[in-house]
Amino acid sequence: MSTHRILPLSLLALLCLLWSPPQATAADTVHLIVFLENGIGTAGQAQKYVDKLIETARSKNGWVKAEGKYVTRRKSAERYVKQKKPAFGFVSLAPYLAWRKSDKLEVLGVADVERAGGRRYHLVSKTASGLAGCKGKKVASNHLDDPRFIDNVVSGGAFTLKDFDLVKTRRPVQTIKKVIKGDAVCALVDDAQVAELPHIDGSKGVRSVWKSADLPPVAIVAFSSASSAERAKFKASLGSLCSGANKATCDKVGIRSIKAADESTYAQVIKSYGN
């Protein structure tokens, strides 16, 4: 092959290399976490809809690539935060309070999430008539990972966990079944679990004998890895994440509404939690 043909072909290859569109790298990827602590249902069921929500957020914010994770367990959430260093998150109240200072969380908005739980806590029982009937007795719960949250925020001063003989459970329905089977006199549950009562075999007669005050909704937060500009743009996009064509996706995840907010929404519970 002649030299005058080799040179143009080599030059063409070089130009193609130089003009290739940039590929997304790990550094370009914006990570988000959706952490609904002790949420009813499995992560696998929710993940595909969370992926669609994150894709909407990516499009609205002009991110090259976005990835997210739906979790219901604190250890899994903490592992994801450590490994992926997410920029943003939808986080239940208890972990928000626990992480607020250590992870330098900034509240950007709130999400009203159906069946997420955590808006109100109950003591339920078949035999006790009130809180006094649960004290000193076996009380089952899957909400014992953060005793400070229960003692300082949920109870409103009515009790501490030390007042009960605790039976720790892992799954929301398992907690209620402890009462049904007589393995516990009472169970400390949240509003999502109470809503499930009619659908659990043998739950007839299990009722709320004490309830907490209403608590703030799921916090939409920025982690320390998000820049000021990214925070401002993401906050401005929140109102559109569940509107129009995106509403169907939010309905699947159980998100009723998303709106911008700030830390003042959580001022009272922050004070009660004590940090």
PLM features per residue range, with description:
Residues 71, 76-133, 145-147:
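Acidic, polar ligand-binding/catalytic clefts
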Residues 8-18:
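Bacterial N-terminal signal peptides
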Residues 67-79, 165-177, 214-216:
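Short helix-initiation/N-cap motifs at beta->coil->alpha
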Residues 35-60, 94, 117-177, 181, ...:
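Bilobed "Venus flytrap"/periplasmic-binding protein-like clamshell domains
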Residues 29-39, 113-123, 201-242, 248-275:
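Periplasmic-binding protein-like
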Residues 27-97:
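Extracytoplasmic small-molecule ligand-binding "clamshell" domains
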Residues 90-102, 180-208:
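A ligand-binding cleft/hinge motif common to bilobed small-molecule-binding domains
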Residues 19-26:
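Sec/Tat signal peptide C-region and signal peptidase I cleavage site
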